[in-house]
Amino acid sequence: MLKYDVIVIGGGHAGVEAAAASARLGVPTLLITLKPENLGEMSCNPAIGGIAKGTLVKEIDALDGLMGYVIDQAGIHYKMLNETRGPAVWGPRAQADRKLYKKAMYQILTNYPNLDILYGKVEDIEIKSSKIEAVILNNGSKILCQKIILTTGTFLSGLIHIGQKKIPAGRVDEEPSYGLSNTLKQIGFKLARLKTGTPPRIDGRTIDYSKTILQPGDKIPRPFSELTNIVNVSQINCFITKTTSETHDIIRENLDKSAMYSGQIEGIGPRYCPSIEDKIVRFSTKSEHRIFLEPEGLDDYTIYPNGISTSLPEDVQHKLIKTIPGLENVKVLRPGYAIEYDYVDPREISVTLETKKIAGLYLAGQINGTTGYEEAAGQGIIAGINAALAVKDQAPFMLTRANSYIGVMIDDLTTFGTIEPYRMFTSRSEYRLSLRADNSDLRLTELGMNIGVVSEKRKKIFTKKCEDIEKIKSLLNTLSLSTSKLAKMGIQVAQDGTYKTVLDLFKIPNFNVEQAIKIFPMLKETQNNNILQLLYIEAKYASYLTRQHADINLFQSEEAQFIPKNIDYFKIPSISLEIQEKLSSHKPTTIGVARRIPGITPAAITAIIIYLKTKYSDGSST
């Protein structure tokens, strides 16, 4: 009988990261997926990154994950979003060639040390004494294991809706999983339904681009991965069009035929990625909505019209598309659809992503209520790391709100749960100026090195980058000009007779890296790895970062105050019954987590701290 230490079920974005992370830690790992050609499949839009999402990708890369490196082998349109705003909200993004992305992912995974891939379907999980024993395939065979990571995406009781038509599926032309849904219910997990959707795909050869707006990418693509020196993939343009009043009229006239508005769909859809029906209803005063025409590949004429996700009947989809400028004669290749699926209340997992009910069972991705490739991948890498560390009897790896967006996401999910698809935003992070995309490796790579999940190649790159940062920082502190000379150059500084270093100049409003290079041409040679830009940001926002670091220190002190697992909140007399019940239900692991539970008052936190000091003066957390 086959036996592996870790088995990952599902080969989507969470699954591939989980499997690779577990394997990197030297643990024999098996990835079970339905189709070999769909490893890392982009089920919806052909893009990676975006605002906050791009930071997640950079954090995954910092831990030696796959997503950033793979998109650099397949990215055909790079763009830094929000670049006119502050660096805390910059969002690296890249359109992908779907075929190149899957090809690169397949090549990496099929040659990954300690990782085997099995093409099959898991029907059940065998559990004994609340511990994982094995997975059972649909052919009846059994594979023994210590840990299981479930990354089922939209496959748990998946149901596609196109108008009144219902198609049981986890994705187009792929059957859903009912067995695992039933298993989770029998164990006692709280399952609910969520919904997501995708737009129709159209033939780019039938688009009149003269009626659209050109959207070029960045002149020089900025890679996602620290392993990528330069993006060698050919770059292409995207285009923008918009809906019209006629489009809106057709949608309103057919709302009763939409699966979403006819009452046919039970699940709640993503608030921040609504269907076109939702947009017309919720934003009824808007006369138009933008649509981004995104190519799906270099040699693929399929276009993804980002902005018109829909569950309307096929004939209605055809009508509304032809009212959009440039799409009047377009050929629809595949209809859009909505899909419903089961998910588990994420409050049933710990911050390691291990379930509280079953030891050795981990959940990652949409099964935890998230939406998006990047959110799934971020959970996948953490689940994979922790499953492998548990096999090796090593301490778990936990990211926090203070050091990563991944930590923010996991804390939000495990503390508050979610009743709608959770998407990452910069606004969810209290410390977003410190948690930028450009410093992800400086925040996380050393943590990954400490547990052994980072390769030797990445270690060398990271070590050299840290050395280069110190050298360039020293140079910036050495190069200087007098205030009088700066004034002659038109740079507004106080005429105090002093000399200003480059780092001093970076703090001046509207002074930027390009000006610094113009004044000191030798700095052009230091632009490798965007180090100069990084030091510019650190200098520009130094006072804000100092204050934020003080806030982070306070946060970390509360996170370090552990609450014993066996605490009885009903024995703390000075807090209300309502709060006692909330705390007993949530089971917070630290004072910091307890403080973030809705409805928990500062007075209650003080009472808990006092109780812990008197009852558990030895600091025990067992």
UniProtKB/Swiss-Prot annotation:
GO function term, MF aspect, one: flavin adenine dinucleotide binding
Major place of residence: cytoplasm
Family annotation (Gene3D superfamilies): FAD/NAD(P)-binding domain, GidA associated domain, C-terminal subdomain
Subcellular location: Cytoplasm
UniProt-annotated binding residues for NAD(+): 269-283
Binding site for FAD: G10, G11, G12, H13, A14, G15, V122, S177, Q366
Pfam families: GIDA, GIDA_C_1st, SAM_GIDA_C
Keywords, alphabetical: Cytoplasm, FAD, Flavoprotein, NAD, tRNA processing
Keyword Methyltransferase: no
PROSITE patterns in the record: GIDA_1, GIDA_2
GO cellular component, one term: cytosol
Family indicated by similarity: Belongs to the MnmG family.
Subunit structure: Homodimer. Heterotetramer of two MnmE and two MnmG subunits.
HAMAP family membership: MnmG_GidA
Name this polypeptide is given: tRNA uridine 5-carboxymethylaminomethyl modification enzyme MnmG
Taxonomic placement: Bacteria, Pseudomonadati, Pseudomonadota, Alphaproteobacteria, Rickettsiales
